[in-house]
Curated annotation (Swiss-Prot):
Protein's organism: Dichelobacter nodosus (strain VCS1703A)
Any one GO biological process: translation
Keyword entries, A-Z: Ribonucleoprotein, Ribosomal protein, RNA-binding, rRNA-binding, tRNA-binding
Pfam family, any one: Ribosomal_S7
Gene name of the encoded protein: rpsG
Function: One of the primary rRNA binding proteins, it binds directly to 16S rRNA where it nucleates assembly of the head domain of the 30S subunit. Is located at the subunit interface close to the decoding center, probably blocks exit of the E-site tRNA.
UniProt similarity note: Belongs to the universal ribosomal protein uS7 family.
PROSITE patterns for this protein: RIBOSOMAL_S7
Name of the protein in its database record: Small ribosomal subunit protein uS7
GO molecular function: rRNA binding; structural constituent of ribosome; tRNA binding
Subunit details: Part of the 30S ribosomal subunit. Contacts proteins S9 and S11.
GO cellular component: small ribosomal subunit
Superkingdom in the source lineage: Bacteria
SUPFAM superfamilies noted in UniProt: Ribosomal protein S7
Amino acid sequence: MSRRVRAPIRHILPDPKFGNVMVAKFVNMLMVDGKKSVAEKVVYQALETAGKKKNMEAISLLEEALDKVRPAVEVKSRRVGGATYQVPVEVRPVRQNALAMRWLIEAARNRNEKSMAERLANEFLEAVEERGAAVKKRDETHRMAEANKAFAHFRW
């Protein structure tokens, strides 16, 4: 076991516009080179645009998009007797959120609309409709876990 002291979990302050911790976390994950104001602008613009298109409140749209992208299971590599197995494990709620946000941001960055706000808005809308790259990533993760179900007894 490690003798090092575990890093304390830092609590994130809610964002100024919506007063929501999830939005603040999303902004922090989107931020590049410490430019938080730019990231905030992009996220707020994306939520506003997507909310108008879908006739939904911005926060509920983000929540729903994250809900549709959250993975329930994932695979972790486990070495047993010289062979490496992909063992399916359940994903903790905090990691579910982190993965969902990471996948949404990654999918938005790989799109080719003009502005990042536009890309993010379209990715949110596609996630709510259960299509798009982020949802595909979640399905792929679930498929991997399903395919390796036989190794579930190696869980630790």
